[in-house]
Amino acid sequence: MDADRRRLLQLIASSSLVPFLELPDGWADAAHASAQSSATPPDSELIASAAEALSVFDFEPVARAKLPPWHWAWLSTGGDGSETMQANREGFERYQIRARRLVDVSKVDTSVRLFNQSWETPIFLSPVGGHRTYNPDGELATARAAKSKRHLQVLSTVTTTSVEDVNAARGEPVWFQLYQRDEWGQTRQLIKRVESAGCPALVFTVDLLGGRNMEQFNRVSQRNRQQCGACHLNGQPLTDLRNRPMLNALSVSATPQPEIGTPTWDYVKRLKDATGMKLLVKGIVTREDAELAIQNGVDGVYISNHGGRAENSLRPTVQCISEVAAGVAGRAPILVDGGIRRGTDVYKALALGATAVGVGRPYMWGLASFGQPGVEAVLDILRREFQLIMRQSGVTSVRGIGATQIVDRQRS
């Protein structure tokens, strides 16, 4: 299949007008097959610049082609056989959008407010570690892209660039994602550093416990451990956490995972007492835990299963939103990530009760493909798609997106 025909088929597959188009025999099926194909296309079919992308999926094969197999496997696989990761994506198919007609949608407002700060879009950048593993500019490129497109950004504990440098590149402080350290003194040290850097919010992660079985990644890493300069700092691999800028001043082992303890609600209260930053808990997926989060003084609830990277056989995060929203009952903002690939996904998550919606792998595809322009293009595409579905559904502001805008196919 030549590149032009492939691009045309992908464009057709992404269109809501497919049922109404008089396509030649077999074209609709071919379009669907093209959109679903996970094989890396020939180099002649890869986009050559970020500006050529029609959807965020166009960046995925470019990133795969550019990255060493070991790096790509780490980014693209999930826990066990990646079932939870796949469920995150497929979960959005359960919901369909109800469109209203004859509404003046000449002006659409995509802005949201979080903790008295206004953002131009509810789409934010979820925490992902080790950006320099995928592009030499790493988190600096991501921060500049987030700044230029006015998106909220959450920085990972295992960032390969310090929070101070990221904030300088961005021009304003990011939110900071925190793993529990085994020693409270180390956690306290991290909190003070992040607080001194001006970060307004701390995102405490509780969805990565007891290790993880990265079966597919391990199969690839056994076959290929190709080295590259981007993975090394001062001659040492960045997988050694002692080289990570937010951890190198602490007593950290050389293991490829943070030293994650076993957090409890008492620990959450301890965090709350230790800082003036807003505190969110990342990894909440049930009503019971959402209610406990509010009872323990949490300022925000973050629905996540770590992109399906840590826990297997979990529900897709999109199917947890309504339940968690019932537990929160409007008392705190709700963030969610997992499987977000389209503007319609953002819309559905908001309709179910989310306040803001995070993307992870897509912007990393953009970063690995073209650096800062790639991240910017991913954010632009998602925002345009989100604006489009708002207009198509007759909604003029994010506040107008609610449960009446979607239908649960399993209950209709």
Where do the language-model regions lie?
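An N-cap/entry alpha-helix motif that binds or orients negatively charged groups
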Residues: 35-116, 222-263, 399-401, 407-412
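Conserved, mostly hydrophobic/aromatic
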Residues: 68, 125, 146, 204, ...
